[in-house]
């Protein structure tokens, strides 16, 4: 392959742009401090993980052995015996959540999906794509699901097989829906546990809660049926990806044998990226639990620092327990555009992922927020 000088210059300019902005991100959940140079040699191969990593596939260039070890790792931290679980490395959180909702719908074809107003915007798309009945549930002011509204809507509709979409860290506020409370409330309606489905969206917090001293309930041991976590958020990856883990008994219900690849297909996508399982494998194999604890602890400390700085300046700021998402009043456009902040309604947030080794980016942002408030008050 060869490029014209103009095209090569365009690539070189983009390289310089990427180098300059590698660690810019403070407004979105993405860790930029990864190093997968040991995997660069594999980019010369078309690695395709079509089908089930646990079975033979007629496409030989796959990374199934590595994907299996990735799934074994996540089954462990999400507290389900590996032999009783199944999942795969997805294209990202949306596919992971779609897989969970798909399983719920296949188990309960007439069931209604309940999700809160603070749920990620992709779930509304999933509802349309799966053509699944749904009801939007109110959120509490801090972003957590309104359990009274959830139960009222289940009761009013007469739904006997609800499909619950629980947030383990909401997109904007980082709130964690209470898995134990949801199950207790549904049990009080007289609905047995085996008659409803509970999916957990842990895109960011799924790699935080396993490594803190007092995590909120979020695992299979706590009662979930499936869970999704992102690979590019807390772990870090040059290619967006995710991991979904579910109960094998439920997944077996959707398995289809495909003669074209001589394998069973259980996944949403057919051809699947074989490079991202290598990256997730390298990440989990190169970090001990102690190192994850240190990494998560540093991010949590940075979030606390941000909250303390905001409050010292008289600015209201919110950060949930075990969260690295700090919510504060939405500043003027020049501030949120300069710092590439995510905004929603009258709030904005910053996220202290692990590439923020010191407080410099946080300080620069908060200084601008303070200056903005002074300008508006003048």
Curated annotation (Swiss-Prot):
What is a biological process (GO) this protein takes part in? carboxylic acid metabolic process
Entry annotated with the keyword Acetylation: no
What molecular function terms (GO) are annotated for this protein? histidine decarboxylase activity; pyridoxal phosphate binding
What cofactors does this protein use? Answer: pyridoxal 5'-phosphate
What Pfam families does the entry give?
Pyridoxal_deC (PF00282)
**UniProt key word Lyase:** yes
Residues bearing PTM N6-(pyridoxal phosphate)lysine: 233
State which Enzyme Commission number(s) the record gives.
Answer: 4.1.1.22
| Enzyme class at the top of the EC tree | lyase
In the record, the note on similarity to other proteins reads: Belongs to the group II decarboxylase family.
Quaternary structure and interacting proteins, as annotated:
Homotetramer.
Kindly provide the name given to this protein in its UniProt entry: Histidine decarboxylase
Q: Which organism is it from?
A: Klebsiella aerogenes (Enterobacter aerogenes)
């Amino acid at each position: 392959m060869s490029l014209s000088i103009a095209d090569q210059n365009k690539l070189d300019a983009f390289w310089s742009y990427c180098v300059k902005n590698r660690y810019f991100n403070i407004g979105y959940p993405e860790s930029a401090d990864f190093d997968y140079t040991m995997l660069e040699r594999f980019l010369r191969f078309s690695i395709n993980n079509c089908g089930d990593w646990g079975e033979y596939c007629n496409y030989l260039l796959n990374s199934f052995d590595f994907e299996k070890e990735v799934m074994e790792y996540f089954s462990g931290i999400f507290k389900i015996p590996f032999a009783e679980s199944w999942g795969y490395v997805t294209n990202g959180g949306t596919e992971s959540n779609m897989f969970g909702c798909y399983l719920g719908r296949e188990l309960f074809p007439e069931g209604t999906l309940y999700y809160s107003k603070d749920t990620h915007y992709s779930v509304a798309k999933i509802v349309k794509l799966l053509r699944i009945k749904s009801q939007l549930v109110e959120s509490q002011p801090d972003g957590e699901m309104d359990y009274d509204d959830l139960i009222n809507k289940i009761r009013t509709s007469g739904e006997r097989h609800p499909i619950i979409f629980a947030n383990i860290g909401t997109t904007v506020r980082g709130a964690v829906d209470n898995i134990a409370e949801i199950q207790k409330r549904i049990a009080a309606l007289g609905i047995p546990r085996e008659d409803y489905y509970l999916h957990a969206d842990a895109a960011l917090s799924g790699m935080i809660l396993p490594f803190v001293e007092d995590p909120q309930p979020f695992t299979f041991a706590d009662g979930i049926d499936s869970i999704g976590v992102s690979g590019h958020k807390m772990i870090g990856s040059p290619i967006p990806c995710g991991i979904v883990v579910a109960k094998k008994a439920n997944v077996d219900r959707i398995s289809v044998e495909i003669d074209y690849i001589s394998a069973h297909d259980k996944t949403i996508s057919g051809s699947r990226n074989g490079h991202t399982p290598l990256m997730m494998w390298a990440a989990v194999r190169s970090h001990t639990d102690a190192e994850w604890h240190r990494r998560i602890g540093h991010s949590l400390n940075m979030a606390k620092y941000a909250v303390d700085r905001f409050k010292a300046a008289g600015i209201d700021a919110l950060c949930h327990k075990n969260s690295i998402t700090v919510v504060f009043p939405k500043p003027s456009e020049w501030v949120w555009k300069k710092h590439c902040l995510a905004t929603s309604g009258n709030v904005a947030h910053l996220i202290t992922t692990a590439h923020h080794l010191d407080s410099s980016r946080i300080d620069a942002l908060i200084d601008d927020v303070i200056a903005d408030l002074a300008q508006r008050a003048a």
